[in-house]
Amino acid sequence: MESRAEGGSPAVFDWFFEAACPASLQEDPPILRQFPPDFRDQEAMQMVPKFCFPFDVEREPPSPAVQHFTFALTDLAGNRRFGFCRLRAGTQSCLCILSHLPWFEVFYKLLNTVGDLLAQDQVTEAEELLQNLFQQSLSGPQASVGLELGSGVTVSSGQGIPPPTRGNSKPLSCFVAPDSGRLPSIPENRNLTELVVAVTDENIVGLFAALLAERRVLLTASKLSTLTSCVHASCALLYPMRWEHVLIPTLPPHLLDYCCAPMPYLIGVHASLAERVREKALEDVVVLNVDANTLETTFNDVQALPPDVVSLLRLRLRKVALAPGEGVSRLFLKAQALLFGGYRDALVCSPGQPVTFSEEVFLAQKPGAPLQAFHRRAVHLQLFKQFIEARLEKLNKGEGFSDQFEQEITGCGASSGALRSYQLWADNLKKGGGALLHSVKAKTQPAVKNMYRSAKSGLKGVQSLLMYKDGDSVLQRGGSLRAPALPSRSDRLQQRLPITQHFGKNRPLRPSRRRQLEEGTSEPPGAGTPPLSPEDEGCPWAEEALDSSFLGSGEELDLLSEILDSLSMGAKSAGSLRPSQSLDCCHRGDLDSCFSLPNIPRWQPDDKKLPEPEPQPLSLPSLQNASSLDATSSSKDSRSQLIPSESDQEVTSPSQSSTASADPSIWGDPKPSPLTEPLILHLTPSHKAAEDSTAQENPTPWLSTAPTEPSPPESPQILAPTKPNFDIAWTSQPLDPSSDPSSLEDPRARPPKALLAERAHLQPREEPGALNSPATPTSNCQKSQPSSRPRVADLKKCFEG
């Protein structure tokens, strides 16, 4: 579309000839045949055949395949004639047709047909075909030409090709002239197809920018067909502009000095001549090596274009180049509309005066700083001036125009005094928006994830604090963290948990049954609950209400699991005491009589109330009377109660115990008073009796007693071995020898009530009617009790085994 048939003859072509390959560069190619025979243009006959061999015939090896290429001749008026060549295999000769019509595909096909006829020695048929085509004139620019042997040349409209006539005529071939009103398409247009295949997108954009700047551009390639196709395709990208300077698709060897011309040019040079060209003084020449796909330039022509235009070309060129159709041509047409579409607003129309173009108005437009800078350079370009003159000529002649360029200007809105490229921006946003969002997401996703994790962990910490403070959670046995109570966890197990403080946290207190002792009569065996330890009464958190989760359903206690759990606990604190419920009730058959039901308060019996115990005087005779009645009370009770192992014990403070015992206000309280001094029972073998004195100074007890529940002083009981030959010495001593000795006068101190948990199964059973009477502990008691002999023997067997 870069050339037009201007003022030419009505014939389809001007001259056809066949030239032989010369032996050297200094010789002229001889003409073997020509048509018409009477062609007498001596200038053309001397100059044109040299363009048929635009390579170094002395060094270039013969080509094994047929090659098609084109050269162009420009006269003083700027009119061009194209020479379409077909180089035979082996480069022995070249067929050439000279025409002003840029019908590349049509003439290449015609040359193939004539070449086949000449190869078969059908010279007459070839001349007849050329004669018919030469005498046929074109009726219009959109004509279709049908060539047939025996019936001449038929010309029809561009709607289609008529069917061949019947008779002896043989259809040779049909040629469809290209539509000048349409854009080049892929793959129909050979030149454009060769360009997008051979040259990269970036180099195509660079070549386009160099041509817009009217640089001296030089292309080199080793294949003539590729070289000329790239040259013509690059000119076609300038539509509606037209390259007005020197155009030589293939430069013959005798014209290599043209490369040193100071004016702009677009020249194609065969690779065999490239070395000779580089030896010349080339300055400010843009060189595109098609074979190496490199672009050498000293200018910043791409940066001189508006950024939005460059972005449009780079983003969409590769996509449209891979698809058939007019995509590539229309893409560059849109770029031209964005660059020069504002020329409409610079057209000045005065009544009775011809239409003119105002350069000042064109430059006064404010489409943006980059485009304004480009316009200041564009007004001096020859191609822009020729474009404006062609438009003004049509307007002043009264001819309207509505070509593809004008339609594109209207479509993209590149007029009205500014470059309105909002559609380009929208297209770029759609095309590149996905990559932009992906990059933003890739950068922000790690930060968002870290923020989310930090917020989540902080929220969990706050929730855990709130759960510790307000939640209905319980402390699991042996742990320091709160967790929801399991449905299978019995309230009896929660009653057996030690009242301890873990890491500054507290747990709800266990239910107390002290109210039962204040109200009167006795209750079923094992139903009593030991009182709180002295530490628990003095702790500030002892006033907390009982958690409702402790009063679960009345499930049976898994005694074996409890014993194993107690054995697995590894607390190493010595001399610690804690209240515990006796395991004697676990040996009985009725478990409900040993533990209170969830719905019945522990301080209220089912039928009656226990009588309140009378307060005992604080005097030494009372303690002595309690000791004298120990034998009578022991005959009624079948066994004594000990506490579990020290794995669940809690260390008590002697100072607190002394303070509690010294306070006279405590004795007026009907509730049980705290133990003034902890007591420990030691079991010492006979062969280690010599070490008892050392054990008395540094006690490391493995059995300890704890106060359980108050009882009348008339029924004390002391645990002591009955015979010394059992090799076990039972002693009782305080934890702190330095504690106040007056604490021994406390009549309300009581003996242990529970046996060691892991040895509870060794205790003998007793009758259901037997009562558990508490005993008052004393120091260094060696009384023998007949009822305790079997138990001591069992303990001895356990230790020896």
UniProtKB/Swiss-Prot annotation:
Spans of biased composition, class Basic residues?
Answer: 504-514
Give the UniProt subcellular location, in the record's own words.
Cytoplasm, Cytosol; Cytoplasmic vesicle, Clathrin-coated vesicle
GO molecular function terms noted in the UniProt entry: guanyl-nucleotide exchange factor activity; phosphatidylinositol phosphate binding
User: Where do Basic and acidic residues bias regions lie?
Assistant: 756-768, 791-801
InterPro entries for the chain: cDENN_dom, dDENN_dom, DENN_C, DENND1A/B/C, Tripartite_DENN, uDENN_dom
Q: Where is this region: Disordered?
A: 479-540, 604-801
Query: Motif FXDXF motif in this chain: where?
Result: 401-405
What Pfam families does the database record attribute to this sequence? dDENN, DENN, uDENN
Composition-biased stretches, type Polar residues, lie in 641-662, 693-703, 773-788
Residues making up the signal peptide according to the UniProt record: none
Q: In Gene Ontology terms, what is a biological process of this protein?
A: endocytosis
Top-level taxon: Eukaryota
Q: Which residues carry this modification: Phosphoserine?
A: 553
Which terms are listed as keywords in the entry? Cytoplasm, Cytoplasmic vesicle, Guanine-nucleotide releasing factor, Phosphoprotein
Q: Which residues form the uDENN domain?
A: 13-157
Q: Where is the composition biased (Low complexity)?
A: 619-635, 734-744
What GO cellular component is one of the record's annotations? intracellular membrane-bounded organelle
The record's principal subcellular location, in a coarse class, is cytoplasm
> What is its biological role?
Guanine nucleotide exchange factor (GEF) which may activate RAB8A, RAB13 and RAB35. Promotes the exchange of GDP to GTP, converting inactive GDP-bound Rab proteins into their active GTP-bound form.
Protein name (record): DENN domain-containing protein 1C
Which species is the source of this protein?
Homo sapiens (Human)
